[in-house]
């Protein structure tokens, strides 16, 4: 019985953990990449739903990413070459971290 209660608290704690800014940048670019298979742009509202974040937070991060030249934003949002490089590099780093985590758990 105690283990079940502990598990519920653990799940709630994990659910409340916030994404880092860099993770949210990656999630935003991933949402754009997934949504632009046939187009080269996507609306902010679509990104908001795919990233499961508030519109205010998304708008703030989109502006930061535009200032850092990761995205181009006019009426629609486009990923720059720098943004695609960031997405690719982050995916590689994330995969490396997951591999190391699996190795540690296996030992």
PLM region descriptions:
Residues 26-37, 91:
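Short, locally clustered residues in the helix-turn-helix/winged-helix DNA-binding domain
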Residues 38-50:
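Short acidic, hydrophobic short linear motifs in intrinsically disordered regions
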Residues 52-66:
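Short amphipathic alpha-helical interaction segments
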Residues 85-107:
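Short, amphipathic alpha-helical interaction segments positioned at domain boundaries
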Residues 66-77:
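A short, conserved structural fragment
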Residues 76-86:
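Accessory beta->alpha helical hairpin/"wing" motif in late/C-terminal subdomains of nucleic-acid enzymes
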Residues 2-29:
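Short alpha-helical segments that sit at the start of domains
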Residues 18-22, 40-41, 55, 76:
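Alpha-helix N-cap/helix-initiation sites
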């Amino acid at each position: 019985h105690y283990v079940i209660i502990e598990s519920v608290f653990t799940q709630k704690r994990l659910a409340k953990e916030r994404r880092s800014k860099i993770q949210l940048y990656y999630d935003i670019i991933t949402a754009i990449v997934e949504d632009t298979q046939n187009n080269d742009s996507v609306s902010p509202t679509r990104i908001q739903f795919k990233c499961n974040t508030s519109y205010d937070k998304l708008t703030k991060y989109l502006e930061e990413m535009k200032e850092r030249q990761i995205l181009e934003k006019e009426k629609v949002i486009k990923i720059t070459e720098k943004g695609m490089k960031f997405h690719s590099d982050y995916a590689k780093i994330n995969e490396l971290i997951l591999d190391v985590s699996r190795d540690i758990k296996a030992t």
